């Protein structure tokens, strides 16, 4: 296929014996002219509606059609469009990225020839804001295509602008793979994650209708399932078990948070149908597996830890047990919903990187496969092309590292809001894989490449994704392979080094302040669980809700995560408040020590065992030992008496604090007032003694004054008597 004679007229063959760039005769023969000068800015936008075929062959016809839109404020006259193409194929993937980012600058234009025979007149005068349709068609045999590879392709718009000259008024570049049937194909593993934002409260109420709408016809998850169901042998299923669980919940009827209240959702039937279709699609994939598949009677589905937990952030905050719980419970939840065993648990690292501590924890909890970015484990030799499998070392042994190709995942994340964007994304994806197939040498230990999104919450355009999957196995440079196929390879075939996990990766995690709030709710749950005689069926729903609050999804929507944490905390506090002390008012002790009666109520539907303690304010004025092992049946009250000693004569404010069996505070304390009659009697004696003292002083004073008055009167009488 590298010989031009296979695709151009015989009288042109001689012209292409020498390279295109130095063959001016060849340019004339093809009706091609050098690239036109580029204006200061593009004024006409090119919107592509169609580009066929995906992989052109000799005798095919290349067709490109679309619209031209005048985005300027002036009229563009004599508008035409024509096709341009590079003289030689791209040889490196970096060139694809470079070409995609280039401006329409003639000094750096990668397009060498513009084919005049493709020129079509579009509009005599394209007014501002107006659009006009165009279609370019050319036999593939007439294209100046040389050796196999990816060629830069361009639709150039010409017209008369303000300067009065025919100049380039706009254009769009894309890629044209030109690969022979004897191409050395790569094996493409398509990872197909199904997950969504787990915004479900502990009581099952949804914070919003995002998931029900996504499961309904036309929704994101509905589209992903439809595409996968059409390509059961080409994709590798991965799902968050929480999504399967919530889909089942929705199918059984659901409520949605609506301000302070709730409303009944009406998309239950759609959720049930989605689950049924998923089961059928998984059965189809299982039926197409090779007879010697290791999956046995398991579904060809791997699951992430429950709610796609952000293991890095959670581990950093010391909540290791939550990571272990979300990992170990994942497969059983999925199997329960799907009524059949699944093919194990893996961890899809948010952001594509994993620190050593988190890797060790995952390995210790039974995870044997992690999904990372390619540069998380780059080849030790910089000249080696990275393929799809490596080994991630941990303290507990090596884990399979599935390495998603960064170029492909970045391409899948390109804008796809229009048909034109979808086509450009599709062509770039095909270009990336075609160049890869040429770069991987025959002696490489692997030709498997992993394609997948940058995160599990992807939202691709269905049409373009369908076309890409259709191309896998039909274009000559792409064969399909499964994740199971990949995992049978030697994961140490390419020597690798471990990439870093630096400040940028840490900053992308759930924030430490957020995880601290989650930790606070976990402590609430631990306290509540401690007093329940039988926590089964109550605390597990809160434990799952707390795991949902630790999802990596909240990296993308932190406000929704905060709302979920708050709702769980409020609901849990309401449960805690159903076990409480009824005591209030003033209690008088018959002496400085006495018994304080306390009534404890249990409004829960199951028995609890608590302790209780009196605490004075200030504490130094009250001496009291806690009382433990108080069991209260559901819906009942129990009265107990606590011995207490009040120090001092004033009324003492005290709290009646319930305790967990291990002595931790439970709930909020009730407030009472304590006073002692012993101090009241003492005060009365003091007052009586003081009164008697005062009376004595008064009597003595009066007596003294009377005596003094009498003495003075006698003295005066003696002075007035005559001397004899």
How would you label these PLM feature ranges?
Residues 58-74, 592-602:
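Short beta-strand elements of extracellular/lumenal beta-sandwich folds
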Residues 104-145, 622-648:
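Intrinsically disordered, low-complexity Pro/Gly/Ser/Thr-rich segments with frequent PxxP/GP/PP motifs
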Residues 142-181, 564, 648-708:
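Terminal connector regions
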Residues 165-292:
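Active-site beta->alpha N-cap acidic-glycine motif
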Residues 226-229, 235, 335-338, 353-378, ...:
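Catalytic grooves of carbohydrate-active enzymes
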